[in-house]
Amino acid sequence: MKVLLIKDVKGLGKAGEIKNAKDGYARNFLIPKGFAKLATDDVIKEWQEEQKRKEEELKKELAELNELKEKIESVTLHIKHKLGANGQLYGAITNKEVAEHLKEHGIEIDKKHIDMKQIKTVGEYTVDVKLGHGIHAKLKIVVEGE
């Protein structure tokens, strides 16, 4: 019996492949558990259309992420912070504070996506921002004392 695999099946194949499976295996395990569908022309056509739609959504999402990356990399955050007695910052700058400053520039990023150590001294820093799908942006931060 020919089946279209919906999920990867160990020993049979990967999702999207059309495979020959024994009738009992297909009827009693693969199809009821949602691992496969009977490979009719309509099912194959529907699967291909769904894959095209997913691919288009992914392209659109990647384009939006690349646009966001360019926007982040074009911004330099200037953060003014109180200084302690020894010239160090009074309190550290965290990813939460960086996310709040990005909001002021119209960029909303979850603080969990900003990969940085706490900044405790005045100076220039480059911070990695993870946007998803393997896309990373470099954010420049300039910390100044008050």
UniProtKB/Swiss-Prot annotation:
Known role: Binds to the 23S rRNA.
Keyword Transferase: no
GO terms for biological process, alphabetical: translation
GO MF terms, alphabetically ordered: rRNA binding; structural constituent of ribosome
Recorded coiled-coil stretches: none
High-level lineage: Bacteria, Pseudomonadati, Campylobacterota, Epsilonproteobacteria, Nautiliales
Name of the coding gene: rplI
Keywords noted in UniProt: Ribonucleoprotein, Ribosomal protein, RNA-binding, rRNA-binding
UniProt similarity note: Belongs to the bacterial ribosomal protein bL9 family.
UniProt protein name: Large ribosomal subunit protein bL9
InterPro entries from the UniProt entry: Ribosomal_bL9 (IPR000244), Ribosomal_bL9/RNase_H1_N (IPR009027), Ribosomal_bL9_bac/chp (IPR020594), Ribosomal_bL9_C (IPR020069), Ribosomal_bL9_C_sf (IPR036791), Ribosomal_bL9_N (IPR020070), Ribosomal_bL9_N_sf (IPR036935)
Entry's Gene Ontology cellular component terms: ribonucleoprotein complex; ribosome
Keyword Ribonucleoprotein on entry: yes
Superkingdom of the organism of origin: Bacteria
